[in-house]
Amino acid sequence: MRKLFFFLCTHVPKQRAKFTRIMESCQKKQKLETPTELSDMPDDLIFKIFSFLPFFKEDLATRFISEYGKGLWNPDPNAIFDDESLDMTCMSFVYGSLMSKDAQILDSLHLKLRKYYIASDINFLVQLGVNRSMRELRIDFFGKTLELPCCLSTCTTLKVLVLDHLNIMSVPGWFRLPSVETLQLSSVTGGSNYVPSLIRLCSVHERLVVDQNRNKDLVNINVPTLRSLSIDNKRRGHVPLGSFWINVPSLMFLNIKDTFQTIFESMPAMIKANIEVAHDQSQSVKFIESLTSTRHLCLCSPTSENPYPNGTKFSNLVHLKLCTCSAGWQNLLACMLNDAPNLRSLTLKLRQKSDVNPKKVWEKPTVVPECLSTRLEILKWRDYEGTEHEKDMVGYILANATFLQRATFSTKDRNQCDSRFSELQSMERVSEICEFVFD
């Protein structure tokens, strides 16, 4: 009870004097030597305490006290507090977290706060989660400015923090997120350095998710402990967006969708990368070159005649997915086949139809790439259209992939299925064990 009393006085400071008088009166009436738990108090006293809390509703408080007394309340490990409704589900989280002596560990808490609140009210809600060893917290603030709840700086159980549609003007120098491993920022705005400021709060940060950089500034992502990075920075409407500078040597997993220029530094620990960019990265020589260590690469990008420096090798690359919507896809594929000697699986896919034709007819290399003659086993071609450039490329692969085991093709134009697939089956193929599959 001492902890509860301290919590109420601290997080609802305006009612401190009233709480003190109530607790003193309770102890005199009950003639108790030590304070009891809140759940051991009379219903009318519990109701009076609840009446001083933020978000109080008389009918819901009465109903909850009755249900709790009958043993009908069961804690929800995934709590949602939505101030648009403030129904029994919302208030059960508040009242139950205060009443229960050993409330169940909270797997997640989702706060949807549309109205304006002072910082202490938000801190009150978050502290309820902290007291229940909260693992994940999501705050949707609907465009308002958020002062980070100070109680988070002492929370050692929080693993995932999601901030959605809010503004952060400043982060106190003393503030920390000691146990947060995953930080997700969705439509968050703030000062010029708000992203680096938030990143620095996480001492064990392993995963970062950023959905739209609305600050129009270059965001430097430089986190020694970061293992996974996901960025969705595609323009939606006319909202101006900024760009990123990715400098994370320890990064193992990268997922990025970007319509703006991104600067890539070396990522020697990379295992899997999924990259979709809508601008030509040819001026950034470190773009594809920074991905040379990856084993799984999915790439959709406009390219130039020289997509990366000569001599670049993708020795670890085993699985490659390449988009065929850009004018330079044949040139990029030819280069990567030549520079990925251990490639075993190749998938070609048309993400979005383009009216732009390849810049020029692909010139077959004089020397067969090592991966075709010794490694490639799986070929998948999604949304195959049967253009001259596609037929030219697939014909070359089938004629030189000695160990190809399966070639799978699909097309969106069902009227042309039979003719296209018949044409593919008639092509020369060097592998005697290759199986053709048409979906």
Swiss-Prot record:
Entries under InterPro entries matching the protein: FBD, FBL13/AtMIF1-like, LRR_dom_sf
Keywords, alphabetical: Leucine-rich repeat, Repeat
UniProt lineage: Eukaryota, Viridiplantae, Streptophyta, Embryophyta, Tracheophyta
LRR repeat feature ranges: 155-177, 223-246
Protein's name in the database: F-box/FBD/LRR-repeat protein At5g56570
Organism, scientific name: Arabidopsis thaliana
Protein's UniProt keywords contain Repeat: yes
Domain FBD span(s) in chain numbering: 361-411
Cystine connections: none
